[in-house]
Amino acid sequence: MTENIIESGDPQARYDSVIEKDSKYVMQTYGRQPLVLSKGKGAVVQDIYGKEYIDCVAGIAVNNVGHCHPTVVKAIQAQAENLIHVSNLYYTEIQAEFAETLASITGMERVFFCNSGAESVEAAMKLARVATGKSAFVAAEHSFHGRTIGALSVTHKSMYRDPFMPPVSSETTFVPYSDAEAIRQAISENTAAVILEPIQGEGGINIPDPGYLKEVREICDETGALLIFDEVQTGFGRTGTWFCKEQFGVEPDIMSMSKAIGGGFPMGAIAAHNGINFGRGQHASTFGGGPLACAAALASVKVIREEKLLERSKEMGAYFMKKLAGMVRDDVVEVRGKGLMIGVEIKYPCGKFVDFAREQGVLVNCTSDSVLRLVPPLVITKEQIDTVVDVLEQA
């Protein structure tokens, strides 16, 4: 971004005004970085002072096609001129078109639209219960599936769960991640589903052992429990395929999606196979599958296809991990990931890396205390990756 995109007015005064208003009016639930961002393009964002940052957070793995991709922007603008919202009491052409598109890229027959990742997990849990007539769940330790009450029932981290106990589902059993036998032992006659992230995101970019998910699939088939994959963070090219399930050759019964689905526009969805359906009136969403969201999502899918971002995610991810592994540091435990979903485990809390990188014009964040999460837009360049690695090597 070479153009001057700073709004008029003194930047310091504008910064102070934002911080003051946020402190006064917004519930202070977020541990924010001391940045007020104003614009973004591709893999770069700009703050109100005009400083640019290579963005390896990407709205938390949302901006896969890059910030403000012109195809997505134009699609939203065009749709906004015709129809913004009508609710699901009526049909719209664009929702039907995106439903067909989503069924095609997921390889699943039925979809339901919502607005966020947590909503998609809630919908998946409800669907599992209604499809099986059972109520219990098996989930993994270090899992993260959302902060709404239902999703918290299958989210492991006590910091998120404990203030809101008891959970909606008190019948959730947590087992070690990547331990299929533990899942077998945990499934009961009342288990509706096993819910897993194919790669754990918030838990530390944890990749399961080879064969783990296939074995879980076999166990679910044997016991009659459904298998839910939470692909909220791993979907839409993040790991180098449309969905991470393709990396492991395993097909879930239900899949939750959000984050990158709308190219930065809020949207969520679940997909399921025939025979696993809600009945009329069993679930609903006022805004789910709205015209603007579907326009953005169709545009996002188009960009991923036309710009070959699945292949680019693999290529840039391999390049990024090779460069990271070559850093001259003695405090890096491991570099791991798939595609452009990368974790760098450090021997100690990684907060200082986040602060140093920000000061040097790179945005990263920690997932778990000691793992740096790098999830840049899939359009990131090798030159930008080189800059990021140079900064992290100096931290």
UniProtKB/Swiss-Prot annotation:
Q: What cofactor does this protein call for?
A: pyridoxal 5'-phosphate
Q: What is this protein called?
A: Acetylornithine aminotransferase
Source species taxonomy: Archaea, Methanobacteriati, Methanobacteriota, Stenosarchaea group, Methanomicrobia
Q: Which reaction does it catalyse?
A: N(2)-acetyl-L-ornithine + 2-oxoglutarate = N-acetyl-L-glutamate 5-semialdehyde + L-glutamate
- Principal place where this protein is found? cytoplasm
State the coiled-coil residue ranges: none
Give me the segments passing through the membrane: none
| Cofactor annotation remark | Binds 1 pyridoxal phosphate per subunit.
Q: N6-(pyridoxal phosphate)lysine is carried by which residues?
A: 259
